[in-house]
Curated annotation (Swiss-Prot):
Heme 1 (or BL or b562) is low-potential and absorbs at about 562 nm, and heme 2 (or BH or b566) is high-potential and absorbs at about 566 nm. It is a multi-pass membrane protein. The cytochrome bc1 complex contains 11 subunits: 3 respiratory subunits (MT-CYB, CYC1 and UQCRFS1), 2 core proteins (UQCRC1 and UQCRC2) and 6 low-molecular weight proteins (UQCRH/QCR6, UQCRB/QCR7, UQCRQ/QCR8, UQCR10/QCR9, UQCR11/QCR10 and a cleavage product of UQCRFS1). This cytochrome bc1 complex then forms a dimer. The chain crosses the membrane at residues 33-53, 77-98, 113-133, 178-198, 226-246, 288-308, 320-340, 347-367. Heme b b562 binds at residues 83, 182. It is found in: Mitochondrion inner membrane. GO terms for molecular function: metal ion binding; ubiquinol-cytochrome-c reductase activity. Belongs to the cytochrome b family. One of its GO terms (biological process) is mitochondrial electron transport, ubiquinol to cytochrome c. GO terms for cellular component: mitochondrial inner membrane; respiratory chain complex III. This is Cytochrome b. Its cofactor is heme b. Component of the ubiquinol-cytochrome c reductase complex (complex III or cytochrome b-c1 complex) that is part of the mitochondrial respiratory chain. The b-c1 complex mediates electron transfer from ubiquinol to cytochrome c. Contributes to the generation of a proton gradient across the mitochondrial membrane that is then used for ATP synthesis.
Length: 379
């Protein structure tokens, strides 16, 4: 008799995705981040659900409802900090996952890659709206500054901003709609992640060598289920350590002050995971130019597959491209640092140079270097 997991309509979907899935035998720990992102999403949805039971999306009570969660709700402080720091873990896994894709040429699976870029945008939008909900100083001013950027769009800009605000400033209507979107988007992200997996399983996983691995596949279970469980345990260990020992390490002290439209904080800055994009935005003196650079800093990922000029897929055997990849990583870390600094000398010029280097590396230097490496191999 055939095993039930292979014949049952529902179980065979799970079976073909997580049990009998043929996987390359040589994928490293860099391939763990997909499953870790799934775990992060589940943690965020569950903690978010319990927070939503106690949160009120009204400008008068939002801040106090968060205080109430931390003080009066059983383990409310734990749920709140798991959710806040879970977002940071989510973005760490996201950045490493995207970095892995860039390094090993996973972007050659076009559909999977493009849905991944769409997922990145969706997660960033969700995180931004979630940051507004506690209604602290940085929540309010962050929302004001970022939504105001849309006014740079010619002709419809100012109308668009007022439409998003639901009035003439960030107020009750804005908070309520941000809460609604923040609640629904994670479920849309989960659906998109399903489509992401669907397209990935059409082609099969890439591997570190970038070569076809059809001749050497192993079943996902037990090999990679065990490997993923190790990753999940390390993720949970890191997250719980962060939550229990220094829950406010990655937050902004300004957000413990209730929102006040009459008092602007000295340095308005987003959460750490948006600082690189914020630095690119600030490095251009023109408003519309800055907004375009901000969007393009992420959208540029969708162009990467078309800039692949190498005869080899992975960077595993391409030392020059490897050097450039790590320069790109260092550049992004520099941008992250600059994004958190005040707008003054020397930070302005460092930010501008780092922004130029970011776009130059991806659009010009890396494709040319790949062609040079092809010539070295006389291909």
């Amino acid at each position: 008799m055939t095993n039930l997991r292979k014949t049952h309509p529902l179980m065979k979907i799970v079976n073909s995705s997580f049990i009998d899935l043929p996987a390359p035998s040589n994928i490293s720990s860099w391939w763990n981040f997909g499953s870790l992102l799934g775990v992060c999403l589940i943690i965020q949805i569950l903690t978010g659900l319990f927070l939503a039971m106690h949160y009120t999306s009204d400008t008068m009570t939002a801040f106090s409802s968060v205080t109430h969660i931390c003080r009066d709700v059983n383990y409310g402080w734990l749920i709140r900090y798991l959710h806040a720091n879970g977002a940071s873990m989510f973005f760490i896994c996201l950045f490493l996952h995207v970095g892995r894709g860039l390094y090993y040429g996973s972007y050659m699976y076009l559909e999977t890659w493009n849905i991944g870029v769409l997922l990145l945008f969706a997660v960033m939008a969700t995180a931004f709206m979630g940051y507004v909900l506690p209604w602290g100083q940085m929540s309010f001013w962050g929302a004001t500054v970022i939504t105001n950027l849309l006014s740079a769009i010619p002709y419809i800009g100012s109308d668009l901003v007022e439409w998003i605000w639901g009035g003439f400033s960030v107020d009750k209507a804005t908070l309520t709609r941000f809460f609604a979107f923040h609640f629904i988007l994670p479920f849309i992200i989960a659906a998109l992640a399903g489509v992401h997996l669907l397209f990935l399983h059409e082609t099969g996983s890439n591997n570190p060598s970038g070569l076809c691995s059809d001749a050497d596949k192993i079943p996902f279970h037990p090999y990679y289920t065990i490997k993923d469980i190790l990753g999940v345990l390390l993720l949970i260990l890191t997250l719980t350590s962060l939550v229990l020992f220094s829950p406010d390490l990655l937050g902004d002290p300004d957000n413990y002050t209730p929102a006040n439209p009459l008092n602007t904080p000295p340095h308005i800055k987003p959460e750490w995971y948006f600082l690189f994009a914020y630095a690119i935005l600030r490095s251009i003196p023109n408003k519309l130019g800055g907004v375009l650079a901000l969007v393009l800093s992420i959208l540029i990922l969708a162009v990467v597959p078309f800039l692949h000029t190498s005869k080899q897929r992975s960077m595993m055997f391409r030392p020059f491209s490897q050097c450039l990849f790590w320069i790109l990583v260092a550049d992004l870390l520099t941008l992250t640092w600059i994004g958190g600094q005040p707008v003054e000398h020397p930070f302005i010029i460092i930010g501008q140079l780092a922004s130029i280097l970011y776009f130059l590396l991806i659009l010009v230097i890396m494709p040319i270097t790949s062609l040079f490496e092809n010539n070295l191999l006389k291909w």
